[in-house]
Amino acid sequence: MIVTPTLAFAGGNHQDKNAGVQYSGPVKVSDLTQVINDSSMFTEQKVVVEGKLVQQLDHDTFIFTDGKAQVQVELDDDIVLAQPLDANTQVRLFGEFEGGNTPEIEVDRIQVL
């Protein structure tokens, strides 16, 4: 007799977009200038950066600045915010930095500060 683990899910989709830990303590923020300077064509690393989305290039692509450096960011399609953003809105972005010809951060989550 072979026993295999089985998962059973009752009814539909259980992915709550608002689910997760609501942590309000300190967060290690990456220095954007250092991340860019230390990158190569194949660099991929998780980052948390704080600053502003200063220009929209496409429906999900923006220019982000921390006040010292700029980088292109692409927002995940699943990101939904309760409030609109503008070029003066201070945000914290959680995502993955990717080096290359056009270094960018693929943003998984935005926190309005």
Question: PLM features: residue spans?
Answer:
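OB-fold and OB-like single-stranded nucleic-acid-recognition modules
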Residues: 6-113
